[in-house]
Swiss-Prot record:
Chain's gene name: rpsP
MF (Gene Ontology): structural constituent of ribosome
GO BP annotation list: translation
Protein keywords: Ribonucleoprotein, Ribosomal protein
Organism: Prochlorococcus marinus (strain MIT 9515)
Name used for this protein in its record: Small ribosomal subunit protein bS16
The family this protein is said to belong to: Belongs to the bacterial ribosomal protein bS16 family.
Amino acid sequence: MIKLRLKRFGKKKEASFRIVACNSTSRRDGRPLQELGFYNPRTKETRLDTEALRIRLTQGAQPTDVVRTLLEKGGLLEKKVRPSIAIGKANLEKEKIAKAKSKESESANKEAES
């Protein structure tokens, strides 16, 4: 299976990454099948070879999570709703509302007692 993943290069503690297509069993920094782009997390610079990426995606290459987000930002993939994140946010909102209601009811009870 072909994966689209990041290949690290650069100085120590100043990493940059190349977006590459490689076999899923190969090493992270091993020889890739094709270089498809560049990503620098320090400057947020991203360069994508859109034509080559489209070809690899139509051939069935699977992007890793980080590469998927870069492709979504680049407009090559539709944004995927991650259910665990959406569910987590919904649960947090419900908890906030429940806490606010309980505080209101406690303050109402204290006022009624006095």
